[in-house]
Amino acid sequence: MEAEDRQALRRERKRLKDKKVRRIVWIVLAVLLAAIVILKLCEVDFGSLSGGSGTSSVLTGNFPYALDGSDGVTVHKQGAKLAVLTGGSITVLNPSDGKEEFTAVHGYANPITAASDSYLVTYDQGGSKLRLDYSGENLYEIENKTGLLCADVADDGKVVYAAQSADKRSDIQVITKTRADKMKYSLSYGFVTNIAIRDNGSQVAFVAMNSKDARLQPKLYLMRLKDTEPYASFDLPGTQVLDIAYRGSSLYVVGGSFVSVVNGDKLETVLKNGEVQTVAYDYSTSGDLVVAYSSYSNATQNTVARITAGGKVQKPFTVQGAIKDLSASGSRVAVLFADKIKIYKLSDGSVVHTADCTDAVRSITMMSSNVFVQRQSVIEKEETKS
């Protein structure tokens, strides 16, 4: 009996010890969970976008909006909506309250998106799949066997895309929102790096990149959908082409060290190669290009200018500090620095709003009087007075 009593006592002691260990483990887990929550709240830092004189920082509706990841995030203006691309999904947000109007998982390895007023084209660059979405509905997803290079979408839902060619270098194709073929063209000169379609879907532009003696040789082509060959082509400066975009009948060409505007079959270089370094750019609601540039790389003094479709540089002004991003809306431009967001009047360069931020802010998107701030895995809304 004594032996049995001792065994029973040992079992009871072991049970109490195990219970104590489990209690300690749960306490530790609870503390860790609380610490994680606190760290996340500190990371979001809701109060760090406090405005300066005459400003108001208000978080409304579902803002701050939580993203499903922090890598590869881009925010686009899609008409009066916000299109948000992450490494896992494409989402359209109502900018007034942050509510999702559409979201879809894309499953692409290297997703890129382009937006018109109503349509979104999202594709897997270097991969095979491309999808077109409209007002919360997926119209189609196609598969290309040779590898997609770039794509754009018009206001009427036409999609132009370039892919690697089985016979030449690049294939350019235009399809409608119902997947009807409208144009096909194959190019031997080089791989297409940039592509654009006019708002009304009547013509396209694309840049093909070649090289000689270790020097880049980009060439711009213009082509009407009704034609079988480009109606114009231009040799561009030997630097990276950052973007091409139609605004009305005019085409902007933004290079790493130049800016040009094409009207008809004439190209005018507005900012000359070798004299500027492009830092950041955006397009205003009026159709003008707003660009920040400096005289050399990594400069802390930059010039911000509005360039009209006619190729005129309107009232450039100087800002101090390294620029991370900018976004234009109407007559104003928001500029992101390492520790601040400043909003300037394009007419005279005067500062109308200042908000503090941290270096964790990666991009900004301005719509009307609001600035949407992407910080890691959240999008915050900064409201300013008009």
Language model segments and positions:
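Residue position within the beta-strands of beta-propeller blades
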Residues: 84, 122, 161-162, 205-207, ...
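A short beta-strand motif characteristic of beta-propeller blades
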Residues: 53-68, 97-105, 136-143, 180-186, ...
